[in-house]
Amino acid sequence: MPEYLLLPAGLISLSLAIAAGLYLLTARGYQSSDSVANAYDQWTEDGILEYYWGDHIHLGHYGDPPVAKDFIQSKIDFVHAMAQWGGLDTLPPGTTVLDVGCGIGGSSRILAKDYGFNVTGITISPQQVKRATELTPPDVTAKFAVDDAMALSFPDGSFDVVWSVEAGPHMPDKAVFAKELLRVVKPGGILVVADWNQRDDRQVPLNFWEKPVMRQLLDQWSHPAFASIEGFAENLEATGLVEGQVTTADWTVPTLPAWLDTIWQGIIRPQGWLQYGIRGFIKSVREVPTILLMRLAFGVGLCRFGMFKAVRKNATQA
């Protein structure tokens, strides 16, 4: 290498090493439900996530095969696609729904406004409850509360439908989570879940490079563990509360474009950098490696986007 390039190359290498070190040292690893609440409180308070993602802190649905789509519209389309897949579009107005892991209420408001459901959204984050309430007009039949999905405060059989999107990775015990979800569904009611899942490592163990990738996907966003699609379906059926079998589907293909689309939003909407200043810019850029790792993991089959539907067994069948 020419001598005049040694200093710039050295500075670039040093900068990359420092950035990588800071990325690893500032990971938001799961410690307890409080660490999850704190992470979402911070994301909600700073407003950056809402600025770029809108009301919906979940992936979008781009069709199968995927087509180019407005980023926010893809998230709205996801809610309708999930409602249709779960059979919720055939239910009457007034149906009671519990939205577990409701974020700032995007899905809850659609289910209330477009389907006429009476929705209760719960999240572990007080700031998300505050923001969801602020965003919900008085005439929309959706309300929000702080609650722990590992120990829901509702009596058995409280809701016609329980709905949950991308909350499962934050749950330390998937069997307990599965039982709590089904416990609060009325007999004959519906549970519909969408989640990030990992490949079933009982069938194909993680290899030498997949293990550190998975470690970062867990540690960076306060996830104790990912279930596999097969494993969580087994968790649901093991409760003894499911009529027949759990229905599953793999929505990796229609949701995959959302990862790179997330990064693209920051490029085509740079005004957000000005609105939130240098601190907001750094916080946004800091998430890019994790988003790219997510795209890699879902793209090569290390992770999958799982869909689950179960009908609660009637009391006479229990």
From Swiss-Prot:
Belongs to the class I-like SAM-binding methyltransferase superfamily. gTMT family. GO terms for biological process: methylation; vitamin E biosynthetic process. Residues 184-193 are annotated as: SAM motif III. Its EC number is 2.1.1.295. Pathway: Cofactor biosynthesis; tocopherol biosynthesis. Keywords: Methyltransferase, S-adenosyl-L-methionine, Signal, Transferase. It comes from Synechocystis sp. (strain ATCC 27184 / PCC 6803 / Kazusa). CDD domains: AdoMet_MTases (cd02440). Residues 97-106 are annotated as: SAM motif I. Residues 157-165 are annotated as: SAM motif II. It catalyses: 2-methyl-6-phytyl-1,4-benzene-1,4-diol + S-adenosyl-L-methionine = 2,3-dimethyl-6-phytylbenzene-1,4-diol + S-adenosyl-L-homocysteine + H(+); 2-methyl-6-(all-trans-nonaprenyl)benzene-1,4-diol + S-adenosyl-L-methionine = plastoquinol-9 + S-adenosyl-L-homocysteine + H(+); 6-geranylgeranyl-2-methylbenzene-1,4-diol + S-adenosyl-L-methionine = 6-geranylgeranyl-2,3-dimethylbenzene-1,4-diol + S-adenosyl-L-homocysteine + H(+). SUPFAM superfamilies: S-adenosyl-L-methionine-dependent methyltransferases. This is 2-methyl-6-phytyl-1,4-hydroquinone methyltransferase. One of its GO terms (molecular function) is 2-methyl-6-geranylgeranyl-1,4-benzoquinol methyltransferase activity. Involved in a key methylation step in both tocopherol (vitamin E) and plastoquinone synthesis. Catalyzes the conversion of 2-methyl-6-phytyl-1,4-hydroquinol (MPBQ) to 2,3-dimethyl-6-phytyl-1,4-hydroquinol (DMPQ, a substrate for tocopherol cyclase), and 2-methyl-6-solanyl-1,4-benzoquinol (MSBQ) to plastoquinol. PROSITE patterns: SAM_GTMT. Residues 1-39 form the signal peptide. InterPro entries: Erg6_SMT_methyltransf (IPR050447), Methyltransf_11 (IPR013216), MTs_g-TMT (IPR025774), SAM-dependent_MTases_sf (IPR029063).
